[in-house]
Swiss-Prot record:
The chain crosses the membrane at residues 44-64, 78-98, 118-138, 140-160, 169-189, 204-224, 241-261, 287-307, 312-332, 336-356. Its main location: membrane. Belongs to the purine permeases (TC 2.A.7.14) family. It is a multi-pass membrane protein. Expressed in mesophyll cells. GO terms for molecular function: purine nucleobase transmembrane transporter activity; purine nucleoside transmembrane transporter activity. It is found in: Membrane. This is Purine permease 21. Residues 12-34, 367-390 are annotated as: Disordered. Pfam families: PUNUT.
Length: 390
């Protein structure tokens, strides 16, 4: 008996180190869970960086653009060019990504050069037109009014995302869009004059219409970018984001430069620099940093489209809404009357409504992802017990 017990103990000890299929599956699932958490943290870190780029780039670029007009600048086409011409700062990264991409091509389905070129040309023409309309609005409207009208861009993006990208319009999002629309509509009745430049009623209406048109153009642009990433480009890499910014900006810059020479505004640029109130150096530095900050905004905006959606990218752009009017009051002494305050409150309310909907979507997505992971450990046990019974 004692010998049999010793044999049983030895056999049991020999069996203990042997891992079962269930242990292997649980270890694999555990490593996959850690990997998914790590990827989630990295993703949201990128989202945070892109968000900072959008808010800071948009705010600084808008203030610099108005500073150009306030101190003697008058060229709408030049103001358009500097919004687009800063893309060469991205060329070093672009060349590096091209070298690494040529050695590691994975997909058998590479987008044809013709389709890719068509995407960049269409988006470039659209962004060039939208930037020109934005420059007209910046010339005739106070910065605080302009930024509040630009909040309507979120409503346009939601509409075009619904048509092009199957974006769901929940009651909360519809409430957000309604508030943003009312917020912009109120400013149509705000006949305000800038302190440094007297603006007629006709010029104010022209600036208002052009700003709304620019908001609609940018809303369509963001939705088309998301559609291009999903249907045409089909490659989930950050280098694709940089490529889109560079080629799209190249097309738009060429169109803007043609407009600058066709309108004969280039003839007045030398005298404009001579008579600039802050001096020649400040004139050049204003244009340079305006170009750089708009590219920072473009990187953040396109990156958010790549990581999440065009509607979320636009919502983050609207998050910087209170920043520009406050800076405009401090720097340019814009008047913050009651109508503007009401418009700002409605715009912030609309933005918060949209963020709440995003929170609900993320919560539901996490719950749906947790259901299969909690059920999966039971399956190996059931299979193991059925095999033992056999």
């Amino acid at each position: 008996m004692k010998g049999d017990q010793e044999v049983q103990v030895i056999v049991q000890q020999g069996k203990e180190p042997i891992p079962t299929d269930q242990d292997e599956r649980s270890s694999v699932s555990g490593s996959q869970t850690k990997l998914s958490h790590s990827n989630t943290y990295k993703r949201w870190l990128r989202v945070a960086i892109y968000t900072f780029f959008v808010i800071s780039g948009q705010s600084v670029a808008t203030i610099l653009g108005r500073l150009y007009y306030e101190n003697g600048g008058n060229s709408k086409w030049l103001a358009t060019v500097v919004q687009l011409v800063g893309f060469p700062i991205l060329l070093p990264y672009h060349l590096l990504s091209v070298k690494t991409h040529t050695t590691t091509q994975r997909d058998g389905k590479l987008t044809s050069l013709r389709n890719r070129a068509l995407v960049y040309i269409v988006l470039g023409l659209l962004v060039g037109a939208a930037c020109y309309l934005y420059s007209i609005g910046l010339l005739y409207l106070p910065v605080s009014t302009l930024s509040l009208i630009c909040a309507s861009q979120l409503a346009f993006t939601a509409f075009f995302s619904y048509l092009l990208n199957s974006q769901k319009l929940t009651p909360i999002i519809l409430n957000s869009l309604f508030l943003l629309t009312i917020s912009s509509t109120l400013l149509a009745f705000n006949n305000e004059e800038s302190d440094s430049k007297k603006v007629t009623k006709g010029e104010y209406v022209k600036g208002f219409v052009c700003t709304v048109g620019a908001s609609a153009g940018f809303g369509l642009l963001l939705s088309l970018q998301q559609l291009a990433f999903r249907k045409v480009l089909k490659k989930q890499t950050f280098s694709e984001v940089i490529n889109m910014i560079i080629y799209m900006s190249l097309v738009a810059s060429c169109v803007s430069v043609v407009g600058l020479f066709a309108s004969s505004e280039w003839k007045t640029l030398s005298s404009e620099m001579e008579n600039y109130k802050l001096g020649k150096v400040s004139y050049v530095m204003n244009l340079v940093w305006t170009a750089v900050t708009w590219q920072v905004f473009s990187i953040g905006c396109t990156g958010l489209i790549f990581e999440l959606s065009s509607l979320f990218s636009n919502a983050i752009s609207a998050l910087g809404l209170p920043v520009v009017p406050i800076l405009a009051v401090i720097i340019f002494h814009d008047k913050m009357n009651g109508l503007k305050v009401i418009s700002m409150i409605l715009a912030i309310w609309g933005f918060v409504s949209y963020v709440y909907q995003q929170y609900l979507d993320e919560t539901n997505l996490k719950k749906s992802n947790e259901i299969p992971t909690t059920e999966s450990p039971d399956r190996p046990e059931a299979e193991g017990s059925s095999e033992q019974s056999k």
